[in-house]
Amino acid sequence: MAVPSEFKYSKEHEWVKIENNVATIGITEYAQNELGDIVFVELPETDDELNEGDTFGSVESVKTVSELYAPISGKIVEVNEELEDSPEFVNESPYEKAWMVKIEISDDSQLEELLSADQYSEMIGE
């Protein structure tokens, strides 16, 4: 199972890619695999403010609905609107096409609380 080494991870199975002061966030391959076929993705509005741990949307699969949790605090600067029409991207391309939101980071220190790829792999038993 892919766990890209350049990303950080949350214990709730979100991945975080940092570029400058913006974090791109999605769910991991492990999470989408556990959920099964994704049929709907609900995402927030641009400019919404999030605190670490806030729910910012949900993914619905044929099995269940799972909340999405903000791994860091900040302001949403972009939302992947393609997922509204193509939720299957979450299964097909969790680390590329299926990014969910981009957040302007408001507290850099929260990045230290995220897991490395090795720590995340250990957590999921890989």
Swiss-Prot record:
Gene Ontology CC: one annotated term: cytosol
Cofactor note: Binds 1 lipoyl cofactor covalently.
Keywords associated with the record: Lipoyl
Positions in coiled-coil regions: none
Cofactor (UniProt): (R)-lipoate
UniProt-listed InterPro entries: 2-oxoA_DH_lipoyl-BS, Biotin_lipoyl, GCV_H, GCV_H/Fam206, GCV_H_sub, Single_hybrid_motif
Any GO BP annotation: glycine decarboxylation via glycine cleavage system
Residues modified as N6-lipoyllysine: K63
Subunit structure: The glycine cleavage system is composed of four proteins: P, T, L and H.
Known function: The glycine cleavage system catalyzes the degradation of glycine. The H protein shuttles the methylamine group of glycine from the P protein to the T protein.
NCBIfam families per record: gcvH (TIGR00527), PRK01202.1 (NF002270)
Name used for this protein in its record: Glycine cleavage system H protein
Species whose genome carries this gene: Staphylococcus epidermidis (strain ATCC 35984 / DSM 28319 / BCRC 17069 / CCUG 31568 / BM 3577 / RP62A)
